[in-house]
A protein has these predicted regions:
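Short linker/helix segments within small regulatory modules
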Residues: 29-38
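Flanking scaffold residues of small Cys/His-coordinated metal-binding clusters
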Residues: 13-18, 35
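Short Cys/His-rich micro-motifs in 6-15 aa windows
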Residues: 44-51
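Short cysteine-rich clusters marking metal-coordination/redox-active sites
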Residues: 18-20, 40-43
Length: 248
């Protein structure tokens, strides 16, 4: 190899540690491995190859309820979150707020979420709530179910719509954890209800599609799936994406 070829080859190679806490073998592989399931040649531990192997053990599991499906048009009307650190839920450290949107909540959304205009009357605007949430969450990695396609987009859209100064935040979509555990689900998908059923989790005392009820289920699901997969407290091996939160 000439010098240029050698440099290009090195740029295509990445090094990570095996996410198995009992192994931690240094592994090398091409960047084309990212997103693929591989096995450590030393211990045999299977994981998703990713360039987001971190040492942080601090996470925030959250859920949004919104006026609709479109981040560019709709707003969130409720947010709930709980801290998840070192493999454990910190049930005493939670965040919750309604948010008052600029459009009326439709009867369909009220029937779906249980949240109507009377619940958000007098609540702060979504951008105010998001600033408070950002301050509370700190540098934690965010976890949401279907977060990459939905929740993360609403966070970023809220920041952009109101011209807020922003910071990038690492995120995990818990659907990826479900896929790592359950693989091909033969068309039944990885909805939160299906995940709850597969894990045999008890029903929540809170309403489904209320952010508090969904976070209660998702928090227990993340704990259960992580334990079954043998993931380390940093959830190494689970793909990450990024969103934006207000810089406060």
């Amino acid at each position: 190899l000439n010098r240029i070829q050698f440099v290009l080859l090195r740029l295509c190679i990445m090094k990570i540690s095996c996410p198995n806490p009992d192994c931690k073998q240094q592994l090398s592989g091409p960047k084309s491995y990212i997103g693929k399931q591989v096995a450590c040649p030393i211990c045999g531990f299977e994981f998703i190859w990713t360039d987001f192997f971190r040492s942080t053990c601090s996470f925030v599991i959250y859920d949004l309820e919104t006026t609709g499906l479109y981040p560019d048009e709709d707003e969130f009307i409720q947010i709930a979150a709980v801290r998840y650190e070192n493999g454990c839920l910190a049930a005493e450290d939670m965040f919750f707020s309604f948010a008052r949107p600029r459009r009326s909540i439709s009867s369909f959304i009220e029937s779906y979420t249980g949240i109507g205009n009377r619940h958000v009357a007098g609540a702060p605007r979504p951008e105010e709530v998001l600033c408070r949430f950002s301050q509370w969450a700190g540098e934690a990695t965010l976890i949401a179910h279907n977060g990459k396609r939905f929740d993360s987009k609403f966070l970023a859209a809220t920041c952009q719509r109101h011209g807020l100064p922003t910071r990038q935040v690492d995120c995990i979509d818990s659907i990826h954890i479900s896929k790592m555990l359950f693989g091909n689900t033969r068309g039944t998908g990885h909805s939160l209800d299906h995940v709850k059923s597969r894990l045999g989790l008890r029903e929540t005392n809170l309403r489904r599609h209320d952010a508090r009820g969904d976070v209660d289920i998702l928090g227990r699901a993340v704990v259960s799936m992580s334990q079954r997969l043998g993931l380390d407290p940093s959830l190494n091996g689970v793909p990450r994406h990024q969103t934006m939160l207000p810089r406060v």
